[in-house]
């Protein structure tokens, strides 16, 4: 099966009450871990590449890695998506370079300018058979080159979504309902403490999501910054020389609730980084004599695979939906 767009994928997800996992990729082991889990669970998947990943690994290397995944996992639909395209030129480069989906993120611009930039990308993308994700509202946090301070973040305004989608022609819309980028999604003072002494973050703004869905019936919604920051991997990192105090993510039950509504794409990046980093730190700490990268990248890949499997089955609900 060749690379596909997300159009049919999202239509099935919307009707079926599940979401597609959009996992950020940076190297071979991450691509392998994700796609092997999806192949075994018969789940559709979006492999997404940020501007930072393209700078790190090179556009051509990443495309070829994804093409290899397509060849090795022929039974599942795979989308190659640009995450947080900052401008028309970056989106055009990815469209011309084999991507089947791009995101134009002009959410920091004034509303009218966001429409103008997004529409330009949509027109070029649709002429080339590529779909476009846009964004309204701004998430706090840090992801590669996307840096937004908490005081600059803003929830999506539901009263703007109909005009935005109508004027831009975008195929899906990322909204801001309380998620944020990175492993430090919430400050301790924003959280409550449960009976086990664990910090519990504030709930997502499902009222905003439901109002957006009411105004855009049948339209696919996207959640960015949706890593749950598994505490076992945070502990693994901290136990083996790392320093990640108060790393807090989005509770998985809230993501499952969002997937049952109109959210068709859920972005996950930090969880993969935590799994890989924790595994490698533990291996290095326990085996100080080892120096073969294959020896520590192999268990890192295996843990990424199991993490993704858990997301597909227990969080996204997309296992068996390929």
Regions of interest found by a model, annotated:
Residues 4-12, 27-53, 60-79, 84-220, ...:
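Alpha/beta enzyme core
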Residues 20, 104, 294-297:
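Active-site oxyanion-binding pockets that recognize sulfate/phosphate
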Residues 238-239, 250-322:
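C-terminal alpha-helical cap/extension of soluble enzyme domains
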Residues 5-21, 290-291:
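Generic N-terminal amphipathic, Lys/Arg-enriched alpha-helix
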Residues 223-228:
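Short catalytic/ligand-gating loop segments at beta-alpha or beta-beta junctions
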Residues 1-3, 322:
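Basic/polar N-terminal segments that are highly enriched at the extreme N-terminus
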């Amino acid at each position: 099966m060749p690379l596909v767009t997300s159009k049919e994928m999202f239509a099935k997800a919307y009707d079926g009450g599940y979401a597609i996992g959009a996992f950020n990729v940076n190297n071979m082991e991450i691509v392998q871990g994700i796609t092997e889990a999806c192949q075994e669970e018969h789940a559709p998947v979006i492999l997404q590449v940020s501007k930072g990943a393209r700078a790190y690994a090179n556009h051509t290397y990443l495309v070829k890695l994804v093409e290899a995944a397509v060849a090795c996992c022929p039974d599942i639909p795979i989308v190659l998506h640009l995450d947080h395209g900052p401008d028309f030129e970056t989106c055009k480069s990815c469209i011309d370079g084999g991507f089947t989906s791009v995101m134009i993120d002009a959410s920091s611009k004034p509303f009218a300018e966001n429409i103008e930039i997004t529409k330009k990308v949509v027109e070029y993308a649709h002429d080339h058979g590529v779909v476009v994700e846009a964004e309204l509202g701004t998430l706090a946090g840090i992801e590669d080159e996307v840096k937004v301070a908490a005081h600059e973040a803003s929830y999506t305004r539901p009263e703007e979504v109909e005009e935005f989608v109508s004027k831009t022609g975008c195929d899906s819309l990322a909204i801001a309902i309380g998620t944020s980028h990175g492993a430090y999604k919430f400050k301790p003072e924003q959280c409550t403490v449960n009976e086990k002494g664990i910090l519990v973050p504030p709930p997502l703004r499902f009222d905003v999501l439901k109002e957006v869905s009411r105004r855009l019936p049948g339209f696919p919604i996207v959640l960015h910054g949706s890593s749950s920051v598994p505490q076992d991997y945070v502990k693994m990192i901290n136990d083996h020389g790392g320093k990640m105090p108060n790393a807090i993510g989005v509770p998985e039950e809230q993501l499952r609730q969002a997937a049952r509504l109109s959210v068709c794409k859920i972005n996950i990046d930090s969880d993969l980084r935590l799994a890989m980093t924790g595994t490698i730190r533990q291996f290095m700490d326990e085996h100080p004599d080892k120096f073969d990268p294959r020896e520590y990248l192999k268990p890192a890949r295996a843990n990424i695979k199991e993490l993704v499997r858990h997301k597909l089955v227990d969080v996204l609900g997309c296992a068996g939906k390929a």
